[in-house]
């Protein structure tokens, strides 16, 4: 199978999502699958290769390590020709939206992995009441 992994974070960043993306990629390739990683272009990142596609991006206003991508990249014209069988989205943000959109547009199945326990971050957002109950089950 040809699998495209979409993530808002990738090397040279180091975090749990990057580690997960690398692990998925390595293990899927061991099983004989071809993997394409789609992530943001950033300082120190490798250039476009057959395995990693980089999208122009800009920093998130109050979190400099996170980036938004420009979804109007010319490389998207080549996406359909790749013959991707499944899209694995690793983020609910800009690259995740792009992966979901491409899945819808080209009728490619999409799976999504959440890496953040959102209920543990609600207290950082003043719009949510302090006594809100969140029922999230693994």
Predicted features along the sequence, with ranges:
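N-terminal subdomain of nucleotide-sugar transferases
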Residues: 1-54, 79
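Active-site proximal beta-strand in glycosyltransferases
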Residues: 3, 86, 103-121
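Structural motif
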Residues: 38, 89-90, 113
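Short amphipathic alpha-helical segments
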Residues: 49, 99-102, 125
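A short acidic, helix-capping loop that chelates divalent metal ions and anchors anionic groups
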Residues: 60-63, 119-124
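An amphipathic, basic-hydrophobic alpha-helix
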Residues: 61-89, 95-101, 105
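Membrane-proximal helix-turn-helix segments that form the acceptor-binding/catalytic region
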Residues: 105, 132-138
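Short glycine-enriched, charge-decorated loop/helix-capping segments at active-site entrances
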Residues: 125-131
């Amino acid at each position: 199978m040809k699998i495209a992994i979409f993530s808002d974070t990738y090397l040279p960043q180091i975090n749990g999502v990057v580690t997960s993306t690398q692990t998925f990629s390595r293990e899927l390739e061991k099983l004989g699958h071809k993997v394409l990683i789609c992530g943001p272009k950033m300082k120190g990142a490798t250039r476009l290769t057959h395995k990693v596609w980089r999208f122009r991006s800009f920093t998130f206003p109050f979190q400099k390590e996170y980036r938004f991508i420009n979804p109007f990249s010319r490389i998207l014209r080549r996406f359909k020709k790749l013959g991707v069988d499944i899209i694995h989205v690793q983020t609910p943000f800009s690259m995740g939206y792009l992966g979901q959109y491409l899945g819808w547009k080209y009728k490619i199945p999409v799976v999504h992995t959440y890496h953040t326990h959102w209920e543990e971050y609600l207290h950082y957002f003043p719009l949510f009441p302090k006594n809100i109950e969140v029922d999230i089950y693994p």
